[in-house]
Design a protein with these regions (language model features):
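Low-complexity, Gly/Ser/Thr/Pro- and Asn/Asp-enriched, turn/coil-prone segments
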Residues: 1-40
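C-terminal, surface-exposed recognition/capping segments
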Residues: 4-5, 31-32, 36-56, 60-151
Length: 151
């Protein structure tokens, strides 16, 4: 699982001070209310690429899946929705997400998982609800789950 730096907790303390470095040095969830809704200023598009990615949330020897890898996983499900996600070998739950304001949303109804891919000012991730699933772009300051792949 994710390293224990405070960011693995869904109820960690919050701060509105954006980080100017790739590693904030604390476990607080960084909130924001202005564009581009990133926890870091300036943005860095190369934080989570590969096992040696800066600020890689995965343990040593593991990495986040790419958008293409998540898409391949999604298309293997029996159904394109949260039931398919949980019915897959990964047993992906609808854990909800943490908004850029630090609040929890969608617990029990939405599942979201970061990829290592970016799209302009946004991060790419897999999302699903009871009626649909697919890749989407989300604010980098938001918080969704991670699943790590052994490299």
């Amino acid at each position: 699982g994710r390293g224990a730096d405070g960011h693995e907790k869904r109820d960690s303390e919050t701060t509105s001070t954006l980080s100017t470095t790739d590693t904030p040095g604390h476990g607080d969830f960084i909130t924001t209310s202005s564009s581009p809704n990133d926890w870091r200023s300036p943005q860095n598009d190369n934080l989570w690429q590969g096992v040696d990615g800066v600020n890689n949330p995965c343990p040593v020897g593991f990495r986040l899946p790419t958008e293409a890898e998540w898409e391949a996983e999604r298309t293997s499900w029996d159904s394109n929705d949260s039931a398919g996600a949980f019915g897959s070998p990964l047993k992906l739950p609808v854990a909800g997400y943490r908004g850029v304001d630090g609040s929890l949303y969608g617990v029990g109804s939405y599942g979201g998982y970061w990829s290592s891919s970016v799209d302009g000012a946004s991060a790419r991730g897999l999302g699903f609800v009871s009626s649909d699933a697919g890749m989407g772009s989300d604010y980098r300051a938001g918080g969704v789950s991670v699943r790590c792949l052994k490299d």
